[in-house]
């Protein structure tokens, strides 16, 4: 008999956030859980096989196995290069 564990899948945009709780079979990967959650019905822009993901704010691989109680977070792509943004802020501060 396939044992089930409880996990959560979360994703958010500035205008909408969703947290889904679900039961998945032991041995499921992060990618499996994203697909099983149905979160793509809320956010069609998510491509499960290409998503950047993590568990409790720590980046992880789609092939990682989940544990009971894990919160799988799907991350949005960066809109700006962090290094460039730091340079711009530093330049702005030096002008003051």
UniProtKB/Swiss-Prot annotation:
Record Pfam families: Ub-RnfH
Signal peptide: none
Name of this protein: Protein RnfH
Xref: HAMAP family: UPF0125_RnfH
Gene3D superfamilies on file: RnfH-like
Source organism: Psychromonas ingrahamii (strain DSM 17664 / CCUG 51855 / 37)
InterPro entries on file: Mopterin_synth/thiamin_S_b, RnfH, RnfH_sf
Superkingdom, natural source: Bacteria
Family: Belongs to the UPF0125 (RnfH) family.
Sequence intervals crossing the membrane: none
């Amino acid at each position: 008999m396939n044992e089930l564990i409880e996990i959560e899948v979360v994703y958010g945009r500035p205008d909408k956030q969703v947290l889904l709780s679900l039961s998945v079979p032991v041995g499921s990967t992060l990618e499996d859980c994203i697909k099983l959650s149905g979160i793509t019905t809320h956010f069609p822009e998510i491509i499960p096989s290409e998503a950047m993901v993590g568990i409790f704010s720590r980046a992880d691989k789609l092939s990682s196995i989940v544990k009971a109680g894990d919160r799988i977070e799907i991350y949005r792509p960066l809109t700006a290069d962090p290094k460039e943004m730091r340079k711009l802020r530093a330049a702005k501060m030096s002008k003051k």
